[in-house]
């Protein structure tokens, strides 16, 4: 991660915080308990920066060696991808959820929190995808279908700030039936300064909206 982050974080530490957590944006009295929730509680401060290793999840480097890492700052735990200083021309990393049974609820919505830092090109990307035929092993052999979500603004002033993805509709039972896997795929480059930005995700949740 770029050293300038330390300067920004030091400034933030002495700046009053007036916003609310992104996950608060979707909370209301019409939500039932979660079908799926991942907030990366297994992340530890002392292993910050190490590859994520969470039971049931797949952390896969398709190009290069960079995987999704453990992120920790000021008590907040999250998953992080960055190509910074990888020294590899191409980095493609997947973080894939365990199977999620979509037959247990109706009117499902998906939401998560997402942050970026130093991202300046659409080629330095984060994608959300799902699969109904991922076998838990062969990532590239599965069929992955993209889902649209609200991406964080690419502003210097909001580097490392989490934003809500918005609510993503998973309620169509002709599409989302049986087990599905969610995937977060990031692309970057450690040899191209314009493609070595950072993405962070947290509070991934699927819930029933009554």
Question: How would you describe each model-predicted region?
Answer:
Residues 3, 14-44, 208-210:
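Bacterial Sec-dependent N-terminal signal peptides
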């Amino acid at each position: 991660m770029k050293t300038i982050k330390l300067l920004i974080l030091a400034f933030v530490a002495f700046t009053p915080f007036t916003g609310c957590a992104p996950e608060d944006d979707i909370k209301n009295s019409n939500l039932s308990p979660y079908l799926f929730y991942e907030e990366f509680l297994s992340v530890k401060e002392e292993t910050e920066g190490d590859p994520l290793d969470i039971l049931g999840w797949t952390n896969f480097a398709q190009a290069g060696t960079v995987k999704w890492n453990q992120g920790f700052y000021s008590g907040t735990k999250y998953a992080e991808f960055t190509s910074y200083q990888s020294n590899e021309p191409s980095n493609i990393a997947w973080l894939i959820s365990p199977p999620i049974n979509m037959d247990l609820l109706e009117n499902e919505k998906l939401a998560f929190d997402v942050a970026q830092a130093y991202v300046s090109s659409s080629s330095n990307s984060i994608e959300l995808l799902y699969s109904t035929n991922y076998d838990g092993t062969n990532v590239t052999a599965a069929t992955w279908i993209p889902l649209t979500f609200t991406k964080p603004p690419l502003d210097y002033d909001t580097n490392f700030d989490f934003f809500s993805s918005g609510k993503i509709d998973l309620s169509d039972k002709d599409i989302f039936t049986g087990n599905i896997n969610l995937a977060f795929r990031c692309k970057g480059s450690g040899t191209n300064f314009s493609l070595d930005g950072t993405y962070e995700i947290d509070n991934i949740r699927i819930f029933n909206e009554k």
